[in-house]
């Protein structure tokens, strides 16, 4: 079992941490910009249809795959739930995870404010539960979808025994994100990412059901990270050094 390291505030001044935070901000910004932008475009062009859902799923799949690959300096988390899953697996310190969460929320907010400006004040679509879907059902949806996302991250990127999958992790993770949006988009919205939900809610001022997209993804991501690392991976404990980069690759 890997030990969770608290870290130290001195990490924030280390060059590797600063670089990681810059890259994490850029990749999360671009991910949210493309993801929310695709949702705004499809809503304007085709409305709330199956074609629109498919287009949004494909856009998210591609941008997740590319941004994880491009974000090798930070690990390309893009998502507080991914960061939590890696934290509970012992791959990032508590302090650096906290910095990542702030980074991700700021990046998402900046992307959505810019989208609102560039589209002449169009509303940023928020994640809400579909009619007839209860809070409990929505949370379970998000737990399962985010669990599958983190399970894929561990199986294809983190696991040292990934073998022939080495190098394909970002692409396969993107596929899972797209598939999950197709599966759950019509019911819970398939957020899987508190930061992805936070930016649009902040810009639109619509916080309806917003807490669901923190509770569900954080539980699902945390469970997947803890279970995969401590049950499915067999290796001795190696403490996280202060200057260690929390990479996914």
From Swiss-Prot:
Expressed in roots. InterPro entries: Aquaporin-like, Aquaporin_transptr, MIP, MIP_CS. It comes from the Eukaryota. Residues 42-49, 127-137, 188-212 are vacuolar. Keywords: Acetylation, Membrane, Methylation, Repeat, Transmembrane, Transmembrane helix, Transport, Vacuole. SUPFAM superfamilies: Aquaporin-like (SSF81338). The chain crosses the membrane at residues 21-41, 50-70, 106-126, 138-158, 167-187, 213-233. Its main location: membrane. GO terms for molecular function: channel activity. It is a multi-pass membrane protein. One of its GO terms (cellular component) is central vacuole. Aquaporins facilitate the transport of water and small neutral solutes across cell membranes. Transports urea in yeast cells in a pH-independent manner. PANTHER family: AQUAPORIN TIP4-1, AQUAPORIN-8. Belongs to the MIP/aquaporin (TC 1.A.8) family. TIP (TC 1.A.8.10) subfamily. This is Aquaporin TIP4-1. The gene is TIP4-1.
């Amino acid at each position: 079992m890997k030990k969770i390291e608290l870290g130290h505030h001195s990490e924030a001044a280390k060059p590797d941490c600063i670089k990681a935070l810059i890259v994490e901000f850029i990749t999360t910004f671009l991910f949210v910009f493309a993801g929310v932008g695709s949702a705004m475009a499809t809503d304007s062009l085709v409305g709330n249809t199956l074609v629109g859902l498919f287009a949004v799923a494909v856009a998210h799949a591609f941008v997740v795959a590319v941004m994880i690959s491009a974000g090798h300096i930070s690990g390309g988390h893009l998502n507080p739930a991914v960061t939590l899953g890696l934290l509970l697996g012992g791959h990032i310190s508590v302090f650096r995870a906290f910095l990542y969460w702030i980074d991700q929320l700021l990046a998402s907010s900046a992307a959505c404010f810019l989208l609102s400006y560039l589209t002449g004040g169009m509303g940023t679509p928020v994640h809400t539960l579909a009619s007839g879907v209860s809070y409990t059902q929505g949370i379970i949806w998000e737990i399962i979808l985010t669990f599958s996302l983190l399970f894929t991250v561990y199986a294809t990127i983190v696991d040292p025994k990934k073998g022939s999958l080495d190098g394909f992790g970002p692409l396969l993770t993107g596929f899972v994100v797209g598939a999950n949006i197709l599966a759950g988009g019509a019911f819970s919205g398939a957020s899987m990412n508190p930061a992805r939900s936070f930016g649009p809610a902040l810009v639109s001022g619509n916080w309806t059901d917003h807490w669901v997209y923190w509770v569900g993804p954080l539980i699902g991501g945390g469970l997947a990270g803890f279970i995969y690392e401590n049950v499915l991976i067999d290796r001795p404990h190696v403490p996280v050094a202060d200057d260690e980069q929390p990479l996914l690759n």
